[in-house]
């Protein structure tokens, strides 16, 4: 306590007074002392931040630290997710690999943190909290010793002064000696402490390089940790990529063809094969295939299903338009068209060649230059389109129509140009490329092809919903293939008009031709399958192209009133069972076309059914001739419509009459035919039924005027005299269905109203010659169905006429 008091008094004297003060440290040690404080501050803050960077629990063992590590928790979560999803899925495999990798990374992190904690954090802690504070503590202890020494010196000096003035020298001398010893002892302690402090300070300065190594060690440990982590990641990445590459269920829409084929190991793209195979099962007879737009939601769903290689064949077999839309969408979404950008100019140049043989050869050369993958797929697709064109009478998709709707999806320019140019010149050039390839598919790609390459598509039981709505059947069609009349109506919601005809009617084709662009043959205007083509058959005979030869000739009435001299009607013998014999006269043979009805063929695919109207004055049996005015009042004119028949040029016939009977058809009365045109694909299902194998002349027999036949079913009649000259007829008030550009001559008003014209195909014409002739013999076998009374016929057709009229009204409204 006394020592402490002396220190305080000495310190006060040194501070306030002018007492002697001994210097504790040298100038160099004072600089070291200042640096000690700075190093202590830096080491303390660094230790604190490094400790915060540790993810594990500091000071804990490796096992305990691992449980608290976030990476370990993540790894456990990934492994558990993999077990839930299963190893057979791609996502499950990815989770398992990533979980194992994260667990290894967690172990590396634990090792890294332990090493950092041992080699960096703990040494920094010792430096900041132990070594530097010890030096500072020695510095404070030295300061105390110096104060003690100064205090002892001061007291000894005071004692020495006072002893010189005192008379008793002995006691004063003893006290001074004691203080001198105390002073010397304090000086020794100060010297020892100063030496120790100086050594510690110099040692600190010398060890600064060691302190710097702590931070170097930190970087090295981090580098080693990241190096090991990178090694782990680099080792697992190839495994992850291999799993993804081995997984074949990858999106195919919008992906390069070669990439898709390489991943899936296929020769034909999956969407192409899937769509083609399903269309072969359910869409070959679908009307407007590739042209009718599918439901947007159905198309989106099917595209998504094709992307993941999962297709429900049973579901989409009922919607072939969605399948066709998906195929078109896949072709259009390819980054490069199936016929390639590289060969685009060559394709266009080939299409501009005028000579057909050279053009085909140029197209073949370009086709051979296609890459193997593209060549295989275009071959597969063209072979399918060629097969589809075999059903063009039913599906209305001719090679031209298919080229129109699919051409822009198979080839397009790399640089998008003017939209108008794209829609006119370029589009038609592309159509000119695709159409001949489809038409000559076996020449471009010889040999047969197996469409179902993978065998993974079933053959579901399918009912073609549009199969009941085909247009007029071909005469060559087998009777068993023809549908019943009630099944022969197509839905009005399906567009079936010929696309090129619509383009032609808008005058677009002629504009393009005027620009000097070569376009394919426009003979499509007169195609048999076109509804407008059938309407065009009402044009005057001079407007019709020559007709093809026929297998069997059947007489036709002349479309014009025949100018024959008045002569009394001569009796005609009754028809004998051997057939009707009609002898022609050698006067001005006509080139009028007539049609034959194939055995067993009927109205609109109904086996063994036919309708007919008699020519004015025509008679079968001993009944008077029927005029148009004698038709039942409630009978629809649609019952008089005919089916298409083959024709052959023969002289027109003169209707045979009952002895002493002439036609009582009034003046100006048109022939008994509907003045309201019916859509060609909506035929009337009514008519007389004949057993298969029976045939009639082209002149139609009105069901209402059919006589009851009680006589033998086969009889013969010979007509040797022409009919009397009829009076001029008035022109009908309702114009016939025909293109606007065609005008009818006033000299042939009846040609537009004759019942034969509604059933004629494009390319058929009728004669306008005025001749006298005898009708050749006609062999008719009448079955039991003709033995109905007129009253019974009228009752039958009265009920059906109302239903037909309602259907026509609905068709017209829609």
Curated annotation (Swiss-Prot):
InterPro entries attached to this UniProt entry: AH/BAR_dom_sf, BAR_dom, RHG17/44/SH3BP1-like, Rho_GTPase_activation_prot, RhoGAP_dom
UniProt-recorded Gene Ontology molecular function terms: GTPase activator activity; phospholipid binding; small GTPase binding
Residue ranges of domain Rho-GAP in the record: 255-445
Pfam families associated with the record: BAR, RhoGAP
Region annotated Disordered, chain positions: 467-493, 528-769, 784-814
Site (Arginine finger): 291
Subcellular location field: Cell projection, Dendritic spine; Recycling endosome; Presynapse; Cell projection, Dendrite
Presence of the UniProt keyword Ribosomal protein in the record: no
Primary location: other
Region (Interaction with BST2): 727-814
Listed GO CC annotations: dendrite; dendritic spine; glutamatergic synapse; leading edge membrane; postsynaptic density; presynaptic active zone; recycling endosome
Residue numbers covered by motif PDZ-binding: 811-814
Modified residues (Phosphoserine): 493, 805
Annotated Low complexity bias: 567-581, 598-612, 622-637, 684-704, 741-752
Tissue expression notes: Specifically expressed in brain (at protein level). Detected in olfactory bulb, cortex, hippocampus, diencephalon and cerebellum (at protein level). Expressed in hippocampal neurons (at protein level).
Disruption phenotype: Mutants display a selective and highly significant fear of novel objects and increased stereotypic behavior as well as impairment of motor learning. They show a nicrease in multiple synapses in the hippocampus and cerebellum.
Record key words, sorted: Cell projection, Endosome, GTPase activation, Phosphoprotein, Synapse
Domain BAR: 14-249
SMART domains associated with the record: BAR, RhoGAP
Biased composition annotated in UniProt, kind: Basic and acidic residues: 479-489, 790-805
GO biological process terms, semicolon-separated: modification of postsynaptic structure; modulation of chemical synaptic transmission; negative regulation of filopodium assembly; negative regulation of Rac protein signal transduction; regulation of dendritic spine morphogenesis; regulation of GTPase activity; regulation of neurotransmitter receptor transport, endosome to postsynaptic membrane; signal transduction
Entry note about domains: Rho-GAP domain is required to promote GRIA1 exocytosis from recycling endosomes. Rho-GAP and BAR domains are necessary for the control of long-term potentiation in hippocampal neurons. In dendrites, BAR domain mediates the recruitment to patches where plasma membrane is deformed by acto-myosin mediated contractile forces.
Role, per record: GTPase-activating protein (GAP) that stimulates the GTPase activity of Rho-type GTPases. Thereby, controls Rho-type GTPases cycling between their active GTP-bound and inactive GDP-bound states. Acts as a GAP at least for CDC42 and RAC1. In neurons, is involved in dendritic spine formation and synaptic plasticity in a specific RAC1-GAP activity. Limits the initiation of exploratory dendritic filopodia. Recruited to actin-patches that seed filopodia, binds specifically to plasma membrane sections that are deformed inward by acto-myosin mediated contractile forces.
Subunit field text: Interacts with BST2 (via cytoplasmic domain). Interacts (probably via PDZ-binding motif) with SHANK3 (via PDZ domain); the interaction takes place in dendritic spines and promotes GRIA1 exocytosis.
Name of the protein in question: Rho GTPase-activating protein 44
Organism: Mus musculus
């Amino acid at each position: 306590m006394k020592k402490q008091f002396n220190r305080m008094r000495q310190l006060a004297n040194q501070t306030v007074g002018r007492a002697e003060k001994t210097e504790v440290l040298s100038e160099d040690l004072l600089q070291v002392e200042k640096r000690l404080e700075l190093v202590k501050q830096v080491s303390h803050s660094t230790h604190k931040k490094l400790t915060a960077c540790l993810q594990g629990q500091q000071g804990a063992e490796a096992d305990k630290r691992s449980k608290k590590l976030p990476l370990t928790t993540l790894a456990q979560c990934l492994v558990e997710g993999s077990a839930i999803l299963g190893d057979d899925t791609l996502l499950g495999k990815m989770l398992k690999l990533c979980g194992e990798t994260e667990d290894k990374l967690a172990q590396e992190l634990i090792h890294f943190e332990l090493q950092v904690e041992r080699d960096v954090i703990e040494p920094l802690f010792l430096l900041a909290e132990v070594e530097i504070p010890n030096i500072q503590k020695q510095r404070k202890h030295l300061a105390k010793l110096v104060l003690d020494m100064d205090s002892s010196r001061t007291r000894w000096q005071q004692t020495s002064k006072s002893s010189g003035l005192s008379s008793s020298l002995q006691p004063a001398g003893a006290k001074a000696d004691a203080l001198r010893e105390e002073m010397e002892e304090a000086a020794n302690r100060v010297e020892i402490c100063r030496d120790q402090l100086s050594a510690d300070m110099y040692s600190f300065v010398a060890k600064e390089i060691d302190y710097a190594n702590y931070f170097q060690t930190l970087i090295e440990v981090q580098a080693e940790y990241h190096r090991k982590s990178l090694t782990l990641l680099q080792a697992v990445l190839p495994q992850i990529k291999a799993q993804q590459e081995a997984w074949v269920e990858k999106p195919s829409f919008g992906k390069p063809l070669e990439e898709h084929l390489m991943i899936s190991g296929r020769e034909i793209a999956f969407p192409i094969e899937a769509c083609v195979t399903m269309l072969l099962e359910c869409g070959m007879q679908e009307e407007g295939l590739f042209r009718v737009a599918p439901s947007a939601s159905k198309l989106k769903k099917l595209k998504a299903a094709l992307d993941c290689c999962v297709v429900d064949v049973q579901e989409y077999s009922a919607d072939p338009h969605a399948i066709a839309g998906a195929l078109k969408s896949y072709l259009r979404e390819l980054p490069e068209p199936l016929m390639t950008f590289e060969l685009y100019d060559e394709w266009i140049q080939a299409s501009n060649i005028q000579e057909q043989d050279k053009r085909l050869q140029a197209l073949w050369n370009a086709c051979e230059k296609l890459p193997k993958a593209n060549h295989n797929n275009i071959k597969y697709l063209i072979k399918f389109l060629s097969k589809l064109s075999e059903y063009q009478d039913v599906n209305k998709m001719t090679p031209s129509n298919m080229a129109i709707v699919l051409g822009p999806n198979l080839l397009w320019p790399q640089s998008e140009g003017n939209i108008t140019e794209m829609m006119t010149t370029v589009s038609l050039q592309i159509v000119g490329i695709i159409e001949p390839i489809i038409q000559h598919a076996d020449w471009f790609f010889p040999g047969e092809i197996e469409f179902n390459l993978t065998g993974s598509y079933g053959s579901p039981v399918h009912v073609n919903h549009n199969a009941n709505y085909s247009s007029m059947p071909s005469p060559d069609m087998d009777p068993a293939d023809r549908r019943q009349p009630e099944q022969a109506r197509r839905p009005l919601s399906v567009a079936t008009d010929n696309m090129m005809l619509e383009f032609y009617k808008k005058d677009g084709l002629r504009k393009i031709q005027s620009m000097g662009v070569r376009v394919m043959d426009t003979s499509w205007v007169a195609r048999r399958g076109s509804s407008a083509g059938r309407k065009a058959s009402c044009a005057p005979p001079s407007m019709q192209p020559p007709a093809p030869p026929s297998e069997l000739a059947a007489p036709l009435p002349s479309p014009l009133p025949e100018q024959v001299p008045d002569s009394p009607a001569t009796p005609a013998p009754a028809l004998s069972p051997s057939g009707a014999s009609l002898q022609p006269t050698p006067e001005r043979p006509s080139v009028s076309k007539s049609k034959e009805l194939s055995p067993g063929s009927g109205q609109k695919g109904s086996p063994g059914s036919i309708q007919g109207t008699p020519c004015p004055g025509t008679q079968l049996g001993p009944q008077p001739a029927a005029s148009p005015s004698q038709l039942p009042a409630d009978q629809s004119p649609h019952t008089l419509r005919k089916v298409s028949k083959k024709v052959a040029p023969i002289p027109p016939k003169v209707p045979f009459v009952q002895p002493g009977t002439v036609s009582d058809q009034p003046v100006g009365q048109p022939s008994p035919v509907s003045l309201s045109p019916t859509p060609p694909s909506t035929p009337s299902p009514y008519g007389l039924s004949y057993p298969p194998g029976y045939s009639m002349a082209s002149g139609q027999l009105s069901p209402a005027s059919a006589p009851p036949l009680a006589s033998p079913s086969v009889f013969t009649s010979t007509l040797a005299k022409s009919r009397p000259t009829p009076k001029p007829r008035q022109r009908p008030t309702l114009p016939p269905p025909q293109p606007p550009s065609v005008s009818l001559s006033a000299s042939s008003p009846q040609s537009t109203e004759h019942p034969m014209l509604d059933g004629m195909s494009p390319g058929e014409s009728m004669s306008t010659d005025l001749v006298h002739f005898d009708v050749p013999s006609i062999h008719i076998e009448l079955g039991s169905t003709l033995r109905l009374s007129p009253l019974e016929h009228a009752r039958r057709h009265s009920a059906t006429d109302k239903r037909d009229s309602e259907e026509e009204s609905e068709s017209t409204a829609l």
